[in-house]
């Protein structure tokens, strides 16, 4: 849905998606859908990719870089490892092309609303070129540093988010057992020091936030499978750097177990595990 906000902003958008439903949705939003990725890239000033993992990004870049116009700017909004992001950046540079890693936060709602947070790694000159394309999709654009820094920020942010979502779930389960209504706890947390996105937007119980996935049988949102993937990247980074992350590590274990049977549910559904 990110492309939905580019056409109204005056951009001509060519795209490719191997999944017919996604391609059809993009076409409905005014995207000129191509039969393959190199065709979609041909003639483009800016090329944005979003793929499920680093190997897919590297394979895609190997396929599309030779088809790119001279001077094209590449932006990868996938969530991948810092090492993979730097490898992709170097691959683009070997073709004489500028590249940014720009993963996002905000989920499907943010993509539709054009309020995503972009965490950007790469040269400032490249970011300034990217701004007219990113801004229609963004609520915030944060330059995090050199190549790979956007991915570093993303895995750190999502490790925090996972811990928060579990803690919020624990609080609502405890409140239930103490006889405190969900609405009362929501009002207290959102008006006090515990306030965070995991409650004011992604509240894990029905009622207080009508648009939260909890009101729609935990339809994502941000799927548990994606949170589990991001926590895997975070743990890889923790281990490779020798960092201490006891809460992050425990959250990763909890989500890894939950994902085995609940991968397609919103990650706020972790409250179901806490109840049981």
Residue ranges and their predicted role:
Residues 1-49, 67, 72, 143:
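NAD(P)+-binding Rossmann beta1-loop-alpha1 motif at the extreme N-terminus of oxidoreductases
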Residues 37-98:
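Rossmann-fold NAD(P) dinucleotide-binding segment
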Residues 80-158:
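Rossmann-fold dinucleotide-binding core
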Residues 18-19, 53, 123:
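Residues in the short beta-alpha loop(s) of Rossmann-like NAD(P)-binding domains
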Residues 2-6, 88, 133, 174:
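Hydrophobic residues within alpha-helices
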